[in-house]
């Protein structure tokens, strides 16, 4: 059975790069009827926080990336890492190193001065010296001194690294906490991970991890290293490119299915398909369709995708999503006589890019907005006064339907010898405080007769003054 995993470090929020890695691992497992495992690599004691762990869990839940096992925490598995380290020590495949930080710094400085690559020189590898008192040693792997490591990356192809390029990496630190390379290998082995799908910033770690597995006589998983994500300027993705946390996109009013769709298309493709469901992603997903070149993050494309999903979203769902945004804007959407929020969503959803914009566009349905003086000056003209007063009379008694409202606007314009916009635009500004809205008869129909007339009367003083 195929088993994949996502193993973030809880030192920050779930960002775009991590979310895409999680999505690819999730999709591959789901495609093949396998298992998707979540593991929290919390061995960075200074930077790991419970808040970051929760942010990762929340981000995955919002994106719908459900896991079959976990979350497992590395700090709860220390005894297991010690057990394996002891096994390697007994076999002579690992050793204690008593070098101080100062010694290591001096060693690297000398190597740089000699034009050499800084690396551990193996001085404790076969040492028979008496260990210095009071020093907590690290445990190092006896990396092979010759030969090479070759593995087939499912995205990048065959990769070969000479063992002479690798030094004796640390397995356990002096405080007994495993290093990244050791912990991840033991976890993947114990959890029977068959496919390690991760960012290509881990490619250089792979030969080291393979040598640990070989020392243990353990089977190797298959590796797939996903190219990094760049900003539009070709630089590594950072906050200045809009690479905020996944949950920030929720706060900004993006739909999770739009972000999932966008993340999937960042470096992976299925023909020319731009928009596809989660089910289609699982059906089509294959590692062979991941591009070897870095993907470029395009906020405008993400916004466009979100707009497409908003257009077809269920109105009741949109109404629930928009409520917190409207409440933050001082709108009561539950009071008696307020417009049906679902109908408001239906009227507005094709005009916006995000839930936040949808809320902004809906505000005037739930509280009056005072028109800017420039709008009053532009539209509250002497020419409009007569038809507006006439329309006010008509609106007080007609059947409150969109077509009847439209007919009344047209009739008032005709009766006063002006074109329809000369009536519709002042009316729009009076009632909504805006110059751009959906068809004004549709707006008035949802707003209701009583509220429409109240708002008109409030603005009529500017015509009559």
Curated annotation (Swiss-Prot):
<dbReference type="InterPro" id="IPR008925">
    <property type="entry name" value="aa_tRNA-synth_I_cd-bd_sf"/>
</dbReference>
<protein>
    <recommendedName>
        <fullName>Glutamate--tRNA ligase</fullName>
        <ecNumber>6.1.1.17</ecNumber>
    </recommendedName>
</protein>
<dbReference type="GO" id="GO:0008270">
    <property type="term" value="F:zinc ion binding"/>
</dbReference>
<dbReference type="InterPro" id="IPR020752">
    <property type="entry name" value="Glu-tRNA-synth_I_codon-bd_sub1"/>
</dbReference>
<dbReference type="GO" id="GO:0000049">
    <property type="term" value="F:tRNA binding"/>
</dbReference>
<dbReference type="InterPro" id="IPR001412">
    <property type="entry name" value="aa-tRNA-synth_I_CS"/>
</dbReference>
<dbReference type="InterPro" id="IPR049940">
    <property type="entry name" value="GluQ/Sye"/>
</dbReference>
<comment type="function">
    <text>Catalyzes the attachment of glutamate to tRNA(Glu) in a two-step reaction: glutamate is first activated by ATP to form Glu-AMP and then transferred to the acceptor end of tRNA(Glu).</text>
</comment>
<keyword id="KW-0030">Aminoacyl-tRNA synthetase</keyword>
<dbReference type="InterPro" id="IPR020058">
    <property type="entry name" value="Glu/Gln-tRNA-synth_Ib_cat-dom"/>
</dbReference>
<keyword id="KW-0963">Cytoplasm</keyword>
<feature type="short sequence motif" description="'HIGH' region">
    <location>
        <begin position="8"/>
        <end position="18"/>
    </location>
</feature>
<dbReference type="GO" id="GO:0005524">
    <property type="term" value="F:ATP binding"/>
</dbReference>
<dbReference type="Pfam" id="PF19269">
    <property type="entry name" value="Anticodon_2"/>
</dbReference>
<dbReference type="GO" id="GO:0005829">
    <property type="term" value="C:cytosol"/>
</dbReference>
<feature type="short sequence motif" description="'KMSKS' region">
    <location>
        <begin position="236"/>
        <end position="240"/>
    </location>
</feature>
<keyword id="KW-0547">Nucleotide-binding</keyword>
<dbReference type="GO" id="GO:0006424">
    <property type="term" value="P:glutamyl-tRNA aminoacylation"/>
</dbReference>
<dbReference type="GO" id="GO:0004818">
    <property type="term" value="F:glutamate-tRNA ligase activity"/>
</dbReference>
<dbReference type="InterPro" id="IPR020751">
    <property type="entry name" value="aa-tRNA-synth_I_codon-bd_sub2"/>
</dbReference>
<dbReference type="InterPro" id="IPR033910">
    <property type="entry name" value="GluRS_core"/>
</dbReference>
<dbReference type="InterPro" id="IPR045462">
    <property type="entry name" value="aa-tRNA-synth_I_cd-bd"/>
</dbReference>
<dbReference type="Pfam" id="PF00749">
    <property type="entry name" value="tRNA-synt_1c"/>
</dbReference>
<keyword id="KW-0436">Ligase</keyword>
<dbReference type="InterPro" id="IPR014729">
    <property type="entry name" value="Rossmann-like_a/b/a_fold"/>
</dbReference>
<keyword id="KW-0648">Protein biosynthesis</keyword>
<feature type="binding site">
    <location>
        <position position="239"/>
    </location>
    <ligand>
        <name>ATP</name>
    </ligand>
</feature>
<keyword id="KW-0067">ATP-binding</keyword>
<dbReference type="InterPro" id="IPR004527">
    <property type="entry name" value="Glu-tRNA-ligase_bac/mito"/>
</dbReference>
<comment type="similarity">
    <text>Belongs to the class-I aminoacyl-tRNA synthetase family. Glutamate--tRNA ligase type 1 subfamily.</text>
</comment>
<dbReference type="InterPro" id="IPR000924">
    <property type="entry name" value="Glu/Gln-tRNA-synth"/>
</dbReference>
<comment type="subunit">
    <text>Monomer.</text>
</comment>
